[in-house]
Amino acid sequence: MLKKYQIFVGATYNDLMEERSAAINQIIKQRHIPSGMENFGAMGEKQWNYIKKEIDNSDYYMLIIGGRYGSINEYGISYTEMEFDYAYNRGIRIIPFLIKDMDTIPIGKCEPTEEGREKLTKFRRKVEEKAGLVDYWTNKNDLQLKIANSLANVLREYPAETGWIRIDKDTNVAGFLITN
């Protein structure tokens, strides 16, 4: 049976729009299901609660870190770091991509404050320590290629227990049903 996996894409938004789009396109090209804040509409629900639900419903968490730390909550932690911590603590496999050279990032896409730069540096270190193998990217095209290779490898080597399976009319679904 062919399984499709849901992959949550975590990244800051304004500075990584093109990179997020490239990641989502690569996930779709490999016939899987992307999830991320681009798809959030009006819900009448707190943002963090909805993000947690989306991560819980995902099989993998793809993290892209560029030059910004991101929007922070009332405790001074970025939503991207909160997503990473949440996925890590839930045992969801993380597929991390970090910008290789912070000095090559255009000024408008860099963290504007010293405090933000310090938080970003600490976050990068945390990801490097906790997430296992990390891949480093230099530009959007490089990132897209690395995502394609990493996704193929991760899905082959570490297939998630869950996922989406198409059930057609000839499939006996009795084995899939859960009874109370």
State the predicted function of each range.
Residues 89-102:
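A short helix->loop->beta-strand "cap" motif at the edges of active sites that frequently abuts
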